[in-house]
């Protein structure tokens, strides 16, 4: 179970907007799930900030541009849908997404992203 402060939700909304603007809602929700899967994984830090800002190479290369983000209600809705358990799209061990599969273990392709475990 993941609980976020409003400040963390605002930060996540910026990253979701930067990483997946123009993607379908399901694609944005899947990006949120990757963040939460990483927080739950022993392979990654357990805080939102640490997952999003993790060093090079970083999954979230948009981190450096976060202050320029302009998230909309769509990003906030996607976050709350995942936080509240209303949607569950990916496997719990899906930890990566990219425009091309990063590993041969493809979970799903949603919009322009491949989600891998």
List where the protein language model places each region.
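Bacterial extracytoplasmic/cell-wall-associated proteins, especially those involved in peptidoglycan
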Residues: 1-117
């Amino acid at each position: 179970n993941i609980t976020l402060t409003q400040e963390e939700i605002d930060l996540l909304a910026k990253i979701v907007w930067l990483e997946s603007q123009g993607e379908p809602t399901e694609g944005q929700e899947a990006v949120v799930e990757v963040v939460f899967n990483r927080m739950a994984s022993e392979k990654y830090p357990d805080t939102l900030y640490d997952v999003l800002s993790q060093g090079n190479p970083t999954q979230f290369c948009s981190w450096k541009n976060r202050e320029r983000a302009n998230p909309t209600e769509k990003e906030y809705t996607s976050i709350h849908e995942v936080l509240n358990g209303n949607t569950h799209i990916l496997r719990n061990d899906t930890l990566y997404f990219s425009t091309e599969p990063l590993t041969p273990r493809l979970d799903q392709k949603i919009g322009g992203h491949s989600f891998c475990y």
